[in-house]
């Protein structure tokens, strides 16, 4: 997500983008504190722009090797077939899972996102949210978000259609000589042979 860089620069927070491997995948060991000291970690799962999912065991290994910093898993595309990291919240107090209604709930313009974490971490976020949140929500946005969350049938139907279309597109792209990793998002990151 391009705003991570923008916010880090705005608040003068030093950051580093760790490159993906030759298959456009995250290498968990590159995120281990003993190999790469850091003040916190943020990564998308599934990855953007590749759509590749990082397994829960790989996410857990990152958490195990970074017990003293916050690890944020951005799950903007998780509803399109990836596994959420939420089950790891019971075991790791330093995990924060963030999601959005922009993708699978079709509310991109509303700018509704949310964080899932332990009570202490959410309390810290609530303490600063009005100081740093450039996307405050008005009554219309709140009503749209609540309606989207309640409309489970539309959500399931939309996600199913996107996933079916993605799988069909993969088959058609293969016929045309394209190759790609297994996308678990609503897009395909393809290269031509």
Please place each PLM-identified region on the residue numbering:
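PLP-dependent aminotransferase class I/II
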Residues: 94-174, 178-181
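Short glycine/serine/threonine/alanine-rich loop segments
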Residues: 13, 69, 178
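Substrate-binding/gating loop at the entrance of the active-site cleft, primarily
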Residues: 1-13
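Active-site phosphate-binding strand-loop segment of PLP-dependent enzymes
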Residues: 16, 22-75, 79
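Short, structured coil segments at secondary-structure junctions
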Residues: 11-12, 91-92, 176
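Short Gly/Ser/Thr- and Asp/Glu-enriched loop/turn motifs at secondary-structure junctions
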Residues: 181-187
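Conserved PLP-binding active-site segment of the aspartate aminotransferase-like
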Residues: 117, 189-193
